[in-house]
């Protein structure tokens, strides 16, 4: 019984952490995943991954198909996780967002690394930002 109580306690702590990151999910706790919006499903996927208390989280195309407000909420959560010391492996085409949350960046082209360095170095490299990051 003690283990079950501890497990429930840990589960509740983890759930509360996820709901603090994504308060919008708190309103939908009784909903089936299929009845959630695309943004809520993305938040749920991240929250579900966080329930295992990982040190690393991998996210692919977070902003794809989401409304700007939902993208903002998701990236605010990523910033909090980063500030807590979590390693985030993010595959994203939205360069502005990558530069917002990344410490280090690796630019790939056709599966090959064409540039690797800090986000600050990426911002300060006009050839890189124009050629690969789509920024002028």
Enumerate the language-model features and the residues they cover.
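ABC ATPase C-loop
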Residues: 49-50
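ABC-type ATPase nucleotide-binding domains, specifically the catalytic core motifs of the NBD
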Residues: 1-13, 21-26, 117, 135-136
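Conserved ABC ATPase signature
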Residues: 32-36, 40
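Short, glycine/charged-rich "phosphate-handling" switch motifs in NTP-dependent
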Residues: 104, 116
């Amino acid at each position: 019984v003690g283990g079950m109580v501890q497990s429930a306690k840990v589960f509740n702590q983890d759930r509360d952490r996820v709901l603090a990151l994504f308060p919008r999910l708190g309103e939908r706790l009784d909903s089936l995943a299929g009845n959630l919006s695309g943004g809520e499903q993305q938040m749920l996927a991240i929250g579900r991954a966080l329930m295992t208390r990982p040190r690393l989280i991998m996210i692919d195309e977070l902003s794809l198909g989401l409304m700007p407000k939902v993208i903002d909420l998701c990236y605010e959560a990523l910033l909090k996780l980063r500030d807590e010391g979590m390693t985030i492996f993010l595959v994203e085409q939205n360069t502005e967002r990558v530069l917002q949350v990344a410490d280090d960046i690796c630019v790939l082209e056709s599966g090959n690394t064409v540039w690797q360095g800090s986000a600050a170095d990426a911002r300060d490299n006009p050839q890189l930002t124009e050629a690969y990051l789509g920024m002028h």
